[in-house]
Amino acid sequence: MAFDKKLLEIVACPVCKGKLEFNKEAQQLICKADKLAYPINDGIPVLLENKAEPLAE
């Protein structure tokens, strides 16, 4: 199942409530403010802070 980009209009980072960006290659939602990457599993974003990976500097 593919990620529906329309979700970007309604989802937010659970930490800072900021905008998320879709990284198609890595299948992640990125929060640039918190430098976190949230996984997308089977088209479903996993917006849990403990599942996020820190972005490389």
From Swiss-Prot:
InterPro entries: Trm112-like. GO terms for cellular component: cytosol. Gene3D superfamilies: 2.20.25.10. SUPFAM superfamilies: Trm112p-like (SSF158997). Belongs to the UPF0434 family. This is UPF0434 protein Spea_1772.
